[in-house]
Amino acid sequence: MLETTQALFHLGPLAVGTTVVTTWGIMVVLSLGAWLASRRLRLDPGPFQVALEGVVQTIRAAVEEVVPRRADTVFPFVATLWLFIGIANLSSLIPRVHSPTADLSATTALALLVFFSVHWFGIRIQGLRPYLRHYLSPSPFLLPFHVIGEITRTLALAVRLFGNMMSLETAALLVLLVAGLFAPIPLLMLHIVEALVQAYIFGMLTLVYIAGAIQSLEARRSPKEEET
């Protein structure tokens, strides 16, 4: 587990470790895969296109269920986050590759990305003053509690994903040491399920936080506005 923090090479004074390399590798794979998958879309899709469309439609349905009026705005960010974390969690299945999400620095970066994105969506959709005003409701005395809540949920996002993925890798290593060749297949299935579940939880929490940032505007919409 310590290998995730070891430096592979240096760029000037900056040490580049396995977490950074794996993270950039996953981003390249996702970008290249998205480009290749969208080059030759057909009305009569093959198995690969059907699978991709199924993934996209599933994520889209989840987003529409939480923020139906703002699905077009929120979907690209949440879908990208879901796919990245899912692939990152599964990357440890590759021999000698450690999942970036088993490194606290990576999960902290993801949590900070969510933190700033939530506020960005809130300000973009509501406007700066209306968005900031909701921190003073129902009483200005609750402002410190709102601020503490924002900080603690960001920390919880980072620590939850890191702790679960680190414990998953540690448990897998211990089982392999004890059970040897009898463990790989059940362990592989457990790893896949847990990796996807953790990605789902992180993405769903992000979606709920974004919905919370824009809900005051949605609540002010009249029935007539909803029809239009």
UniProtKB/Swiss-Prot annotation:
<keyword id="KW-0375">Hydrogen ion transport</keyword>
<dbReference type="InterPro" id="IPR000568">
    <property type="entry name" value="ATP_synth_F0_asu"/>
</dbReference>
<protein>
    <recommendedName>
        <fullName>ATP synthase subunit a 2</fullName>
    </recommendedName>
</protein>
<dbReference type="GO" id="GO:0045259">
    <property type="term" value="C:proton-transporting ATP synthase complex"/>
</dbReference>
<dbReference type="GO" id="GO:0005886">
    <property type="term" value="C:plasma membrane"/>
</dbReference>
<dbReference type="Pfam" id="PF00119">
    <property type="entry name" value="ATP-synt_A"/>
</dbReference>
<comment type="subunit">
    <text>F-type ATPases have 2 components, CF(1) - the catalytic core - and CF(0) - the membrane proton channel. CF(1) has five subunits: alpha(3), beta(3), gamma(1), delta(1), epsilon(1). CF(0) has three main subunits: a(1), b(2) and c(9-12). The alpha and beta chains form an alternating ring which encloses part of the gamma chain. CF(1) is attached to CF(0) by a central stalk formed by the gamma and epsilon chains, while a peripheral stalk is formed by the delta and b chains.</text>
</comment>
<keyword id="KW-0472">Membrane</keyword>
<keyword id="KW-0813">Transport</keyword>
<keyword id="KW-0138">CF(0)</keyword>
<dbReference type="GO" id="GO:0042777">
    <property type="term" value="P:proton motive force-driven plasma membrane ATP synthesis"/>
</dbReference>
<comment type="similarity">
    <text>Belongs to the ATPase A chain family.</text>
</comment>
<keyword id="KW-1003">Cell membrane</keyword>
<dbReference type="GO" id="GO:0046933">
    <property type="term" value="F:proton-transporting ATP synthase activity, rotational mechanism"/>
</dbReference>
<keyword id="KW-1133">Transmembrane helix</keyword>
<feature type="transmembrane region" description="Helical">
    <location>
        <begin position="16"/>
        <end position="36"/>
    </location>
</feature>
<feature type="transmembrane region" description="Helical">
    <location>
        <begin position="139"/>
        <end position="159"/>
    </location>
</feature>
<keyword id="KW-0812">Transmembrane</keyword>
<feature type="transmembrane region" description="Helical">
    <location>
        <begin position="74"/>
        <end position="94"/>
    </location>
</feature>
<keyword id="KW-0997">Cell inner membrane</keyword>
<dbReference type="InterPro" id="IPR023011">
    <property type="entry name" value="ATP_synth_F0_asu_AS"/>
</dbReference>
<feature type="transmembrane region" description="Helical">
    <location>
        <begin position="173"/>
        <end position="193"/>
    </location>
</feature>
<feature type="transmembrane region" description="Helical">
    <location>
        <begin position="103"/>
        <end position="123"/>
    </location>
</feature>
<dbReference type="InterPro" id="IPR045082">
    <property type="entry name" value="ATP_syn_F0_a_bact/chloroplast"/>
</dbReference>
<keyword id="KW-0066">ATP synthesis</keyword>
<keyword id="KW-0406">Ion transport</keyword>
<feature type="transmembrane region" description="Helical">
    <location>
        <begin position="194"/>
        <end position="214"/>
    </location>
</feature>
<dbReference type="InterPro" id="IPR035908">
    <property type="entry name" value="F0_ATP_A_sf"/>
</dbReference>
<comment type="function">
    <text>Key component of the proton channel; it plays a direct role in the translocation of protons across the membrane.</text>
</comment>
